[in-house]
């Protein structure tokens, strides 16, 4: 009986470890994707603002 209780405890700990590791990896991937999307949005806004200003400065307007 002690052996099956020990096996059950080990299985639960193993499952919790796997679930925690997977959740942590998913959260890291989501955070990285959010950071990439934010960087793309910033560069898009920056270039969208600067390119017309630079071209009008070059053209002398």
From Swiss-Prot:
Q: Where are the transmembrane segments?
A: none
Which ranges of residues are annotated as propeptide in this record?
A: 24-41
Any single Pfam family the record assigns to this protein: Pilosulin
Q: At which residues is Glutamine amide found? A: 59
For this protein's source organism, the top of the classification is: Eukaryota, Metazoa, Ecdysozoa, Arthropoda, Hexapoda
Supply the name of the protein. U-poneritoxin(01)-Om5a
* Protein species of origin: Odontomachus monticola (Trap-jaw ant)
Signal peptide span: 1-23
Keywords for this entry? Amidation, Cytolysis, Hemolysis, Secreted, Signal
């Amino acid at each position: 009986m002690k052996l099956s209780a020990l096996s059950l405890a080990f299985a639960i700990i193993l499952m919790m470890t796997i679930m925690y590791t997977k959740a942590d990896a998913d959260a890291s991937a989501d955070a990285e994707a959010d950071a990439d999307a934010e960087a793309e949005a910033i560069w898009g806004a920056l270039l969208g603002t600067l390119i017309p200003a630079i071209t009008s400065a070059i053209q002398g307007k």
